[in-house]
UniProtKB/Swiss-Prot annotation:
NCBIfam families: PRK00283.1, recomb_XerA_Arch, recomb_XerC. Site-specific tyrosine recombinase, which acts by catalyzing the cutting and rejoining of the recombining DNA molecules. The XerC-XerD complex is essential to convert dimers of the bacterial chromosome into monomers to permit their segregation at cell division. It also contributes to the segregational stability of plasmids. This is Tyrosine recombinase XerC. InterPro entries: CB, DNA_brk_join_enz, Integrase-like_cat_sf, Integrase_catalytic, Integrase_recombinase_N, Integrase_SAM-like_N, Recomb_XerC, Tyrosine_recombinase_XerC/XerD. Keywords: Cell cycle, Cell division, Chromosome partition, Cytoplasm, DNA integration, DNA recombination, DNA-binding. Residues 1-84 form the Core-binding (CB) domain. The keyword Cell division applies. GO terms for cellular component: cytoplasm. One of its GO terms (biological process) is cell division. Forms a cyclic heterotetrameric complex composed of two molecules of XerC and two molecules of XerD. GO terms for molecular function: DNA binding; tyrosine-based site-specific recombinase activity. The active site is at R145, K169, H241, R244, H267, Y276 (o-(3'-phospho-dna)-tyrosine intermediate).
Length: 295
């Protein structure tokens, strides 16, 4: 039996939980697992870190009531408590995680100069570095999801017009755009670094490749982003989701219409996009208090 199956069997047979309650736990575990599979890869329950959980709760919490998010965290806490007591995992990553009641945590993001600092640090000309520079630039310029960038094919790129046809969630297509600087980094990767990485491997048409010349995985991209930001001295726990947040926040801070940002992000519900207006207001409040002349 899988770890999930052992846990669900324990709830049903030893704790005598109702079928409805057991099903709720099953759905909560499946939702978390699916999120990680689509956003960095799922290495196994014994490899999930506190940071993985925080990213999941942050992303999920933008579109759920606080009570629903609390239930999801409670399910994961119960699951890991079971696993640790049975010796099925060594550590419980949920131990130190608490939700602030009644208030959703605002998305974490990077300022434009911070992203610029990271991009400028990727300058040694090595194929993987050129690839990583293109990845960071595209994440920030387009706001694409990790799964969307991972699955990106060359045929989806329109370099001349600075556009990408993105195959989003629920088989919904949309166009995103990128600037001249990102175009330069992408072209440098496609023209020199990608052929160097590809070597004698069959060309699948995937835009981003790993060091073996094969399509890079979501987890490979997530790991690369984390290492890039850590090496640049910004944070030890950066995730592609935060570059997506950074794109949305930058657009709104510079006067973009909320519905336009919704379209670019591929959000089905406007309320999911509205969380970024709170981030923008928080930023503006800080700027006002720092720079308004009357103290």
């Amino acid at each position: 039996m899988t770890l999930e199956e052992q846990f669900l069997s324990y709830l049903k047979n030893e704790r005598s939980y109702s079928p409805k309650t057991v099903l709720a736990y099953q759905k909560d575990l499946a939702a978390a697992k699916k999120f990680w599979q689509e956003n960095g890869g799922f290495p196994g329950w014994d490899q999930i870190s506190r940071r993985d959980l925080e990213i999941y709760l942050l992303a999920t919490g933008q579109k759920l009531a606080s009570s629903t998010l609390s239930r999801k965290l409670s399910s994961l806490k119960s699951f890991y408590r079971f696993l640790t007591r049975r010796g099925l995992v060594k550590a419980d990553p949920t131990v130190a995680i608490q939700l602030r009641r009644g208030k959703k945590k605002l998305p974490e993001f990077f300022y434009q100069d911070e992203v610029g600092q990271v991009i400028r640090s990727l300058n040694d000309g090595k194929p993987l570095t050129v690839r990583n520079r293109a990845i960071v630039a595209l994440f920030y310029a387009t706001g694409m999801r990790l799964s969307e960038l991972t699955d990106l094919k060359i045929k989806q790129l329109d370099l001349e017009n600075g556009m990408i046809l993105v195959h989003g969630k629920g088989n919904k297509d949309r166009y995103v755009f990128f600037d001249q600087e990102s175009k330069k980094y992408l072209e440098e990767y496609l023209q020199a670094a990608r052929p160097s990485l590809l070597k004698n491997e069959p060309d699948t048409g995937a835009v981003f490749l790993n060091k073996l010349g094969r399509p890079i995985s979501s987890r490979g991209i997530a790991k690369a982003v984390q290492q890039i930001f850590q090496k640049a001295g910004l944070t030890a726990g950066a995730h592609p989701h935060e570059l997506r947040h950074s794109f949305a926040t930058a657009m709104l801070n510079n006067g973009a219409d909320l519905r336009s940002v919704q379209e670019l992000l591929g959000h089905e519900d406007l309320s999911t996009t509205q969380i970024y207006t709170h981030v923008s207001m928080q930023h503006l409040t800080v700027e006002y208090r720092q720079h308004f002349p009357r103290k």
